[in-house]
Amino acid sequence: MASYLDFEKNIQQIDEDIINAQIKGDTEAVSILKKNLEKEISKTYKNLSDFQRLQLARHPDRPYTLDYIELILNDAHEIHGDRAFRDDPAIVCFMGYLGEKKIIVIGEQKGRGTKDKIARNFGMPHPEGYRKALRVARLAEKFQIPILFLIDTPGAYPGIGAEERGQSEAIARNLYELSDLKIPTIAIVIGEGGSGGALAIGVADRLAMMKNSVFSVISPEGCAAILWNDPAKSEAATKAMKVTADDLKSQGLIDDVIDEPTNGAHRNKEAAAVAIADYVKKSLNELENIDVRELSANRMQKILKLGAYQEA
C-alpha cells in the first residue's frame, strides 16, 4: 500500500476515489478522476518547499541502492567484506554491466522493513563499511572498471564501537584515496546525503543529485536543536541550510541535477532508474575519453575549489 506525506493528502484522496470507482466498475468516473489526479500531481509538485523535498528524500517508498542495482545492472554479483573486520551490510558493492559497459556500483542501503533496517543499521555505515567500499574501489582501479557511487545515508554511525574502530580515519582515508583513483568515477545522491557519511563515497569526477534528494553537513533537526534548542524548527533550518539539489547546483557544489518523475522517484522507480542509467552512460562516454592521469588531476582541482580558505 502506498505511503503518503502530509502535502500529498489531496493525491491520496483521489487515489482512493479511483480505487472505489474501479471496484464499482464506473469507467467514466475512473477516467475523470485520473485526469484530476494528473492535475493535482502537477499542482502539488510544481512548487515544493525545501522541507517537502527533504520529506521526499526520506520517503519510505523511495528507491534505495539495491532497487537501482536490480533495475539498471545486468549480471550483477555482490562483493563482500573489508578483509579486516566484517561485512557491513549498510554498504553494498556490486560488479556487473550497465548496458554493455562493465561497472562497479558502491552504495549505501537503508533497508526495508524492521529486520532489514536493523541489520543495515538504517543506512549508517560503520568504519568497516567504508573500508569495504575502499577495498572494492581499489579492485575497480586494478581492473580499470569505472565506479558508480550511490549515496543515501543519514550519516556515518556515531556509536562507541564505530569510534573505537576508527570511524573518522576510515572516512578520511576514503577521501584521500578516492580523490586519486585512476579510473572514471560518478557519485549520485539518491536520497539523503548526510555529512561525512556521504562524503566518504562522494569524491568523484561527476557528483550529481536526484531532484528530490538532499545533501548537508548535519540533519535539519540537528541544526535546529543546536541553533535554537528546538528540533521542531527543522523546517526553518532546512531552508536556511540550502540542502536541495538546486541549491547545491547554484553554489557550484555539485555538477548536475537528475530529474525525477513528476510525482517523485517513489511513485515510478523504473523511470527514476532510467534517468540514472542515462546520466551514468552519458557521463562515462565523456570521462572515458580523458586520460586517467588527467582525470585524477581534474578531480583534485575540483576538490580544491570547494569552500573558502587561504593557504599559509
From Swiss-Prot:
Keywords: ATP-binding, Cytoplasm, Fatty acid biosynthesis, Fatty acid metabolism, Lipid biosynthesis, Lipid metabolism, Nucleotide-binding, Transferase. The keyword Ribosomal protein does not apply. InterPro entries: Acetyl_CoA_COase_a_su, ClpP/crotonase-like_dom_sf, COA_CT_C. Pfam families: ACCA. Pathway: Lipid metabolism; malonyl-CoA biosynthesis; malonyl-CoA from acetyl-CoA: step 1/1. It catalyses: N(6)-carboxybiotinyl-L-lysyl-[protein] + acetyl-CoA = N(6)-biotinyl-L-lysyl-[protein] + malonyl-CoA. GO terms for biological process: fatty acid biosynthetic process; malonyl-CoA biosynthetic process. Component of the acetyl coenzyme A carboxylase (ACC) complex. First, biotin carboxylase catalyzes the carboxylation of biotin on its carrier protein (BCCP) and then the CO(2) group is transferred by the carboxyltransferase to acetyl-CoA to form malonyl-CoA. It is an enzyme of class 2 (transferase). PANTHER family: ACETYL-COENZYME A CARBOXYLASE CARBOXYL TRANSFERASE SUBUNIT ALPHA (PTHR42853), ACETYL-COENZYME A CARBOXYLASE CARBOXYL TRANSFERASE SUBUNIT ALPHA, CHLOROPLASTIC (PTHR42853:SF3). Residues 36-286 form the CoA carboxyltransferase C-terminal domain. Belongs to the AccA family. HAMAP family: AcetylCoA_CT_alpha. Acetyl-CoA carboxylase is a heterohexamer composed of biotin carboxyl carrier protein (AccB), biotin carboxylase (AccC) and two subunits each of ACCase subunit alpha (AccA) and ACCase subunit beta (AccD). Its main location: cytoplasm. It is found in: Cytoplasm. GO terms for molecular function: acetyl-CoA carboxylase activity; ATP binding; carboxyl- or carbamoyltransferase activity. NCBIfam families: accA (TIGR00513), AccA_sub (NF041504), PRK05724.1 (NF004344). GO terms for cellular component: acetyl-CoA carboxylase complex. This is Acetyl-coenzyme A carboxylase carboxyl transferase subunit alpha. The keyword Lipid metabolism applies. Its EC number is 2.1.3.15.
